[in-house]
Amino acid sequence: MSDILNKIIAVKREEITDAINRKPLPAMRKDAESRVLTRDFVGALRAKIAAGKPAVIAEIKKASPSKGVLRADFIPADIAQSYAEFGAACLSVLTDQQFFQGSIDYLKQARASCSLPVLRKDFIIDAYQVYESRVMGADCILLIAACLDDAQMKTLEALAMSLDMAVLVEVHDEAELERALKLRTPLIGINNRNLNTFEVSLDTTLRLMGKVPAERLLVTESGITTPEDVKRMRDARVNAFLVGEAFMRADEPGVALAELFGE
């Protein structure tokens, strides 16, 4: 793992311990298992693609470690409604507090304000967080291959699916992709950002996509900032996108989405 990931994971372990002290695992599990009716995250993406449209997972992100605060006027419900109005397929909400200034409440507010399925964007390393994700209303969780070994990924995926949540597994290189393809989830996210240098290259997606079987749903993540970037991806038959920073700096995030994707 990169230095930044090691630092983040160390903080996550402390956060999980604190959370368990506040609400023990049996109570969190009971609450998670009593929740009903997730929204169909994979289905929402596939429906857009079937209609010949880009399937956009629009991100709600206040800040990042590399860029600082992206949006001072940050009202998750308003952002979610704007995204929904202008054609997003799904939402992604950052819930990591220390590094991204996110919040569980932001996910709850975003999901309550519209009908789109919602991804919890965080660093999931423990079963407790999976139950917690379901309790807060997440329809999908992110598993980052760089943070987890094969056994952990398999266990966390199985738990999420048992709770009727989808799983987006994120990879950064060929070795991680090979590991991710052992999982059941159709959702394979290729992050174009190098987590060691924070440099972004869309070539990462183009280089790895040929190794992703056709029955999987490839999502390109990070670095999509211009209509030319979108065209380059769509010409290569990449039709699902996770985009955040490009929208967060805009006055009206949904309008920025429509302009970027030509909707």
Curated annotation (Swiss-Prot):
Its EC number is 4.1.1.48. The keyword Amino-acid biosynthesis applies. InterPro entries: Aldolase_TIM (IPR013785), Indole-3-glycerol_P_synth (IPR045186), Indole-3-glycerol_P_synth_dom (IPR013798), Indole-3-GlycerolPSynthase_CS (IPR001468), RibuloseP-bd_barrel (IPR011060). One of its GO terms (molecular function) is phosphoribosylanthranilate isomerase activity. The keyword Transport does not apply. It catalyses: 1-(2-carboxyphenylamino)-1-deoxy-D-ribulose 5-phosphate + H(+) = (1S,2R)-1-C-(indol-3-yl)glycerol 3-phosphate + CO2 + H2O. Disulfide bonds: none annotated. Keywords: Amino-acid biosynthesis, Aromatic amino acid biosynthesis, Decarboxylase, Lyase, Tryptophan biosynthesis. Pathway: Amino-acid biosynthesis; L-tryptophan biosynthesis; L-tryptophan from chorismate: step 4/5. One of its GO terms (biological process) is L-tryptophan biosynthetic process. Belongs to the TrpC family. This is Indole-3-glycerol phosphate synthase. It comes from Polaromonas naphthalenivorans (strain CJ2). The gene is trpC.
